[in-house]
Structures are given as C-alpha cells and as structure tokens.
UniProtKB/Swiss-Prot annotation:
It is an enzyme of class 1 (oxidoreductase). It comes from the Bacteria. NCBIfam families: ahpD, ahpD_dom. Its EC number is 1.11.1.28. Keywords: Antioxidant, Disulfide bond, Oxidoreductase, Peroxidase, Redox-active center. It comes from Rhodopseudomonas palustris (strain BisA53). This is Alkyl hydroperoxide reductase AhpD.
Amino acid sequence: MTIEVLKERIPDFAKDVRLNLSSMASDETLGEQTKYGLLVATAIATRNVEVIAAIEAEAAGKLSPAALGAAKSAAAIMAMNNVYYRFVHLASNKDYATMPARLRMNVIANPGVDKADFELWSLAVSAINGCGMCIDSHEKVLLQAGVSTAAIQTAVRFAAIMQSVAVSIEAGAASLAVAAE
C-alpha cells in the first residue's frame, strides 16, 4: 500500500483530507529524510494500521534503516513522554514537576540521525498527542538549532493531515460496517 492507495481509501465526505494528503505528498519544503521520517513518525502516532503500512511502504527506499528506526523511536518515546509530561503540566499539584521522571529516554540524546530531524519528528508526534509542555520543549530546541518557524509549522501541518487521514479512513470503515448490518 502507498499514499496513492491510501488516498483511494479516504471517503468522499473527506475530500479536503484527500486533497491535503496529495499536497503533503508532493510538498518539497523539507528534505527527503526529514519529510519521510516525519511521515513515518506521525503515521505511527495515529495508531492506524492502514496509514502506518502505507506510509512505511512510501518511505521504503527513501529512508536509511537508521532513519526509519529513529522515526519509529520518536513515535515510541513520545507515546511515553507525552502522557507523562502532559500529566505534569496539567496537574494542579506542581510537586510533580520537581520529581525525577525516572523514564529511560536515551534515544533523545542519541537518535542515530540528525538531532534536528528527530526533534522535528518528536514535536509533530507531540502535537498529535496533545502535550503542550513537550511541544514547547521541542520547539525551543529546534529554534536554537536554526530550524525555521516555517519548517516547524510544516511539520505540524503534516501531523494534522496524517491524523485527519486516519480518522477519515476509520469513519468510512465504520459507516460501511453500519450499512452492512
């Protein structure tokens, strides 16, 4: 499965989503590794098997094994960190912010790819997962590394599109299941 096949799976009620996916696929704002790592990380964050399979197929040959692994690591480590740090951020009791997290996250310091790419992927996954504290932290690191606000916005736009693709496909499948009853 590829992005083209994925587009065909998007129901007509989500035509805008289909068009956004087409625009994202042809967007050349980001470098190849940055873009395809971003697509893989955000696809994984949607938790939709069809989306993940299509994006991984699309990324095949465009990402080195190290970059593919790093993109998957970004999604995995953010799945943990986004829950923990969203709690720390939202809890009324601010004592939690002073406590050690006691979570292993060595991959952040040594992702095996360009640090800015990994941070951008982590920021996009954090946007999907809704962790404001993580978003702020990754944005700060990216800006210090010289990544433009336009590139950051592109990453978050891609995350938004990827999430909407997953939701649209799931909504279409649910509609078909109901119609079949």
